[in-house]
Amino acid sequence: MNLRDKFENGSILSEDYVLPTIIRLGIIRQIPIFLYINMSSVQFLNKLIPIYSQIDKDKLKENRLSPEEWNLLDQKMSELYNAPLWLNDIEVNSVDDYKSAEEVIAKEKIKYVFIDSLPEAIDKSEIIEWSEEVGFNVYFTNFTLK
């Protein structure tokens, strides 16, 4: 069962589901994913890396890794670096701002777009309609900084 079978286009997904999904689809299965995030890409990666590497985030922050963990981190960072993930951490205020990435989405054959915290002024149905025109599924989430 894939994401499209589980959730209809335009579904709202929790962060607890989205981050492992990004890992499974984008990194492991190499399916292109585009993410609009409302935090810096560094903050987002600081959330994703501990989950993907399965290394305690406090150990990463404090730089207290064993040699084996350093090797694992190096391997996982290489996989993450080579994954077909596109991050947009630029503030988005209109549907046209989202559409500005359409060329990349089409060229890279991106199948899944995740949008973090859709601004209230933007009509979700317009984004869903655009996704159907271009040929990708869009999912909405809210990444909180824990």
Residue ranges of predicted features:
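Walker B catalytic acidic pair
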Residues: D116-L118
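Structured core elements
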Residues: S11, I33-Y36, W86, F114, ...
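Active-site-proximal structural scaffolding
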Residues: E15-V18, I37, S41, D123, ...
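Residue-level marker for well-ordered alpha-helical positions
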Residues: L19-P20, K99, S125
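Glycine-rich P-loop/Walker A and Walker A-like loops and their local beta1-loop-alpha1 context
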Residues: K6-I27
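Substrate-engagement module of ASCE P-loop NTPases
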Residues: I23, I27, E120-K146
